[in-house]
Amino acid sequence: MIPWGGVTCCLSAAALYLLGRSSGRDAEVLETVTRVNQLKELAQLLELDSKILPFIVAVSGRVGSETPIKCEHSGIRGVIVEETAEQHFLKHNETGSWVQDSALMLSMSKEVPWFLDDGTSRVHVMGARGATGFALTVGSEVFEESGRSLVRGTLDYLQGLKMLGVKRIERVLPTGIPLTIVGEAVKDDIGEFRIQKPDRGPFYVSSKSLDQLISNLGKWSRLYKYASMGFTVLGVFLITKHVIDSVLERRRRRQLQKRVLDAAAKRAELESEGSNGTRESISDSTKKEDAVPDLCVICLEQEYNAVFVPCGHMCCCTACSSHLTSCPLCRRRIDLAVKTYRH
């Protein structure tokens, strides 16, 4: 039988190790990117390193836009706004009780051209949603209760529903917040600089600094590797334990089979002596049988006194039979062990 617990632990250890290596490589890549301390230096850096493609840089600044979006509920101005609306209701389940559920009614997203500005210059940002670490903040969360119309309430109740209301959530990338972006720096046809996702290489958008990103990736890499070592040790332990148990079980079965064969041979020898001898020899063999009783083939100490159902064999004592699941003679499954009284 395959030790699935140990195999699963080893596979988990391999997956965690690969995650750790991936995080470690990402941290090493971020350490090699060109840091742009001031955005006005980007033009000079592009001219010096124009032969390097893609030219990966790390820039920092505050989010800005010429045409920001004003959120409807919170009034926050942002460059990316996502709005979702969920209908919340109670419904009848199969047991007849009411359970709460929800359904998505609306999912809308808006984005305007935006840039990073550090006071010295600005750089436009393209495709930030596909970047690692990109996240929007919750601008507002409003719950609008459903109207109490008698007709509508009756129809919903007949359908097994009770409308609670609509939950509207606005997520926004507000203007003015500081961001760090790691990506490919390019110069477009009209002479403006922009940061975009490279064909190969890292692409990060985060509110953390570059040093914090590298530190976090290093911590995750070490954590994954430590967890991988733990799962490896546990998996090896479980597999080794299974192998040892299997070896001991096979040895026990061989010893048990040897005991059964020895007992059967001894019993056959005694029966042959009793059938071929005279009455005196029968008496002598009876004495021998009394000297060598019908012992349990397991412990070889107690007389066998348990009959196995359904096979009908009797070769063990009641104490040993309580630990068996199959008959030592025919290997059939034991449904019941019945104690017998011998005279």
From Swiss-Prot:
It catalyses: S-ubiquitinyl-[E2 ubiquitin-conjugating enzyme]-L-cysteine + [acceptor protein]-L-lysine = [E2 ubiquitin-conjugating enzyme]-L-cysteine + N(6)-ubiquitinyl-[acceptor protein]-L-lysine. Induction: By infection with the bacterial pathogen Pseudomonas syringae pv. tomato, and treatment with fumonisin B1, a mycotoxin inducing apoptosis-like programmed cell death (PCD). GO terms for molecular function: ubiquitin-protein transferase activity; zinc ion binding. Its EC number is 2.3.2.27. This is E3 ubiquitin-protein ligase SP1. Disruption phenotype: No visible phenotype under normal growth conditions, but mutant plants show increased disease symptoms and cell death after inoculation with an avirulent strain of Pseudomonas syringae pv. tomato DC3000. Pale-green phenotype with low survival rates during de-etiolation. Hypersensitivity to salt, osmotic, and oxidative stresses. Residues 245-343 are cytoplasmic. It comes from the Eukaryota. E3 ubiquitin-protein ligase involved in the regulation of protein import in the chloroplast. Associates with TOC complexes and mediates ubiquitination of TOC components, promoting their degradation via the ubiquitin-proteasome system (UPS). Plays a role in the reorganization of the TOC machinery. Involved in a mechanism that regulates plastid biogenesis via UPS. Promotes stress tolerance by depleting the chloroplast protein import apparatus, which limits photosystem assembly and the potential for reactive oxygen species (ROS) formation. It comes from Arabidopsis thaliana (Mouse-ear cress). Pfam families: GIDE (PF12483), zf-C3HC4_3 (PF13920). PROSITE patterns: ZF_RING_2. GO terms for cellular component: chloroplast outer membrane. GO terms for biological process: protein ubiquitination; regulation of protein import into chloroplast stroma. Auto-ubiquitinated.
